[in-house]
Amino acid sequence: MRYGIIGGTGLYEITGQRAQTMRLETEFGSCTAMILKLAGEETAFIARHAPDHSLLPHEINYRANLMGLKQMGVERVLATATAGSLNDRIQPGDLVVLSQFLDFTKGRAYTLFEGKGRAAHVDMTEPYCLHLRDDLLKAGTGMGEALHPVGTYVCTEGPRFETAAEVAMFRALGGDVVGMTGVPEVVLAREANMCYAGLALVTNWAPGISQERVSHEEVVRAASQELEKVRRLLEMAIQRGRERSERCSCQQSAPI
C-alpha cells in the first residue's frame, strides 16, 4: 500500500464506498485508518480530526497518524487542510498546492526522535515532495486560476482564529494561506522518510481582510461545497503517480 490520504476539516471520508477500518497501535499511541480503493490503488485514509471532528488542532496525535501509515507500508501521503486566504489573488473556493510553510505553533510534539538518544536534523529546504506536488498540478490541468501551483502555508496553534494584527504580520512575511494543522505533520512525514504533499482548500478570507467574521461552521459549510473537486483531484493525482517507481529523496531523509 503506497498511498495514504489525511483528510482535513470536512473530508471525513473519501469515496462513499464501504471500507475496512483498522485501529493501529504505534509507539506514540493509536490511530484509526480506513482502507479503500482509489484510482485502482489500495489507499489508507485517516480523518485528521477524527470522523466526528472531535479533535482540536493541538489535540491531534500527528505522530501516531504518520507512524500508523508508515506501519501500513505507505510511502506517499496526500494531505488536505482548510485554510484562510492571506493573498488577494487566492479566492475562497480555490485550491493551493503548498510549497513552503511558516510555523507559528507553540507546544506540539514536533519530532519522532525525541528520547531516542541521537541527533536527527532533517533538511526542510523543500518541505513538500516535488514529485507529489507535480502529480497534483498535472492532475489539476484545466482548473486554471482555481488551482495555485505554489503557496506558503502559515500554521498557527489554534484553536482560536487569528487576530487582524497577526494576519497583517503573516501577509508581510509572505504567507499565502493560514491554517492550524499543517505543522508538525509535514515535518514528521519527512522524518519518517515519506513523501508528503499538502493541498489547501481555501474556505474564507483570513480575519481582518474582509468585513465578514470567521466561524467554524462557515468553514465546514464552505469546505463541503468543494469536497467533490478535492476528491477528484486526489484520485487523478494517484492515477498519475502510480506508474512512477523511482525512489524519491524524501524517502532517504532521516535515520529512522
Regions found by a protein language model. Name each.
Residues 68-73, 89, 173, 187-195:
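Alpha-helix C-terminal capping segments
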Residues 180-218:
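Zn-dependent metallopeptidase/amidohydrolase metal-coordination segment
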Residues 66, 167, 183-186:
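Generic hydrophobic/aromatic pocket-lining and core-packing "Φ" positions
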Residues 206-256:
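His/Asp/Glu-rich mid-to-C-terminal helical/loop segments that flank catalytic regions of hydrolases
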